[in-house]
């Protein structure tokens, strides 16, 4: 449990996030493109078994907001040509849909506590 100005906030990644981060690693091992060095670091942080920092959680929420449009791209969803697209691979590195909802909720709490 992280303490943000006296407010306890659980910043431990959840199982859905870990599943997506592992999917990212599996895709990369298979030679798929997508994701930056930061994405690789984020997947490692999610899979580490450690809590994320408050700053990382706020950064994650902002990243998902910027990349929401990637979900409309060709190859984002299973069964589409080009799956997984570069955007889908990167989305997984950051924890996927589970990471988006998790980081959005916690980011709001962190910002309120600050």
Where are these regions (language model features)?
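Extended terminal accessory/targeting regions
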Residues: 1-114
């Amino acid at each position: 449990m992280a303490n943000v100005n006296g407010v306890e906030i659980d910043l431990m990644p959840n199982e859905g996030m870990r599943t997506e981060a592992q999917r990212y690693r599996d895709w990369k091992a298979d030679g798929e493109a997508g994701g930056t060095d930061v994405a690789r670091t984020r997947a490692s942080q999610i899979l580490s078994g450690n809590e994320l920092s408050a700053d990382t959680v706020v950064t994650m929420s902002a990243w998902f907001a910027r990349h929401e449009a990637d979900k409309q791209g060709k190859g984002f969803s299973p069964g589409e040509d080009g799956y997984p697209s570069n955007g889908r691979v990167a989305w997984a590195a950051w924890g996927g849909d589970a990471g988006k909802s998790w980081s959005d909720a916690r980011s709001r709490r962190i910002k309120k506590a600050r």
